[in-house]
Amino acid sequence: MLVYLAEYLTRFHTGFNVFSYVTFRAILGLLTALMFSLWWGPKLIERLQLMQIGQVVRNDGPESHFSKRGTPTMGGLLILGAIFLSVLLWGDLGSRYVWVMLFVLGSFGMIGFIDDYRKVVRKDTKGLIARWKYILQSLAALIIAFFLYTTAANPGETQLVVPFFKDVMPQLGAVFIVLAYFTIVGSSNAVNLTDGLDGLAIMPTVMVAAAFALIAYLSGHAQFANYLHIPHLPGSGELVIVCTAIVGAGLGFLWFNTYPAQVFMGDVGSLSLGAALGAIAVLVRQEILLVIMGGVFVMETVSVILQVGSYKLRGQRIFRMAPIHHHYELKGWPEPRVIVRFWIISIFLVLLGLATLKLR
């Protein structure tokens, strides 16, 4: 929004031209989201407490989690509010990339909000029925996938980038829709499964978003893209503002979500952030890289799949409890140890993912 104002003011003073630079707006976007989160956080937490919107804790979970019962949830509203404010202020509202991301965050955030509302306000322990949750997620993801496929302006927007191979970028055609769908829905649910400990999901999300900010910047410049053998995607630089807004909002939320948490993000936060990471990966053509950098999310999801599959096929559980972070809790690991070690794994995987840009 302010891009247009700055463009007009440039007529009177060339100093306003600085707002045309993506890097400058990205920094402002991060700071805006961070400061808004820190300012609004205490107010939102107090409001959630007054409304008695507290976390529901399973009776069959780790005993250490019983103390979390009643902790304010739906804190994802803080994250989404900070991201929307930052992107609307500093993003180019003429960019399709910006509107795609706002739609993803808004639609999946609404799905998560409905689920949280049913759980904590209407006291329905099941929340939004799984079937309906999946249908709504699928509908939103397919809308995005079809839109991106039908409005693709150059071949690079529908290619698949394969890490470690600089000349392997097959044209997907209509398969793009299928890949985009599974990436967005899968990432949304993966982050949702990971969000089980204080700060466990938000920090890897911040790390992956920061990495995608760099990739989006490189993809938007022909010289860098050609050097790294990745698709050149004109206009993708606007995704940098979205990514840094996620980083700022995430760090601001972590201020209140760090152990012991004052607030949880709820499904309104985890489903929307996960879908956002998936959508960014689709937009910059780095779906495989998301699997690498978001390895913690993949690990959590695979542990649930293996646990359920093993129990149904053999009648035996592989882990003491799934997702896998609960397995380590039941083994006696203190919650902060599990969290920090998963963060360390995430740092390693994000750096490994970035290294693949050059190792080709």
Curated annotation (Swiss-Prot):
GO molecular function annotation = metal ion binding; phospho-N-acetylmuramoyl-pentapeptide-transferase activity; UDP-N-acetylmuramoyl-L-alanyl-D-glutamyl-meso-2,6-diaminopimelyl-D-alanyl-D-alanine:undecaprenyl-phosphate transferase activity
Q: Enumerate the catalysed reactions.
A: UDP-N-acetyl-alpha-D-muramoyl-L-alanyl-gamma-D-glutamyl-meso-2,6-diaminopimeloyl-D-alanyl-D-alanine + di-trans,octa-cis-undecaprenyl phosphate = di-trans,octa-cis-undecaprenyl diphospho-N-acetyl-alpha-D-muramoyl-L-alanyl-D-glutamyl-meso-2,6-diaminopimeloyl-D-alanyl-D-alanine + UMP
State which pathway it belongs to. Answer: Cell wall biogenesis; peptidoglycan biosynthesis
Pfam assignment, any one: Glycos_transf_4
Membrane topology per the entry is: Multi-pass membrane protein
CDD domains attached here? GT_MraY (cd06852)
One GO cellular component from the entry?
plasma membrane
Give the keywords, sorted.
Cell cycle, Cell division, Cell inner membrane, Cell membrane, Cell shape, Cell wall biogenesis/degradation, Magnesium, Membrane, Metal-binding, Peptidoglycan synthesis, Transferase, Transmembrane, Transmembrane helix
Could you tell me the Gene Ontology terms of the biological process aspect for this record?
A: cell division; cell wall macromolecule biosynthetic process; cell wall organization; peptidoglycan biosynthetic process; regulation of cell shape
Cofactor(s) needed for function: Mg(2+)
Its annotated function is as follows:
Catalyzes the initial step of the lipid cycle reactions in the biosynthesis of the cell wall peptidoglycan: transfers peptidoglycan precursor phospho-MurNAc-pentapeptide from UDP-MurNAc-pentapeptide onto the lipid carrier undecaprenyl phosphate, yielding undecaprenyl-pyrophosphoryl-MurNAc-pentapeptide, known as lipid I.
Q: Which family does the record claim for this protein?
A: Belongs to the glycosyltransferase 4 family. MraY subfamily.
Q: This chain belongs to which protein, by name?
A: Phospho-N-acetylmuramoyl-pentapeptide-transferase
Q: Which organism is it from?
A: Shewanella oneidensis (strain ATCC 700550 / JCM 31522 / CIP 106686 / LMG 19005 / NCIMB 14063 / MR-1)
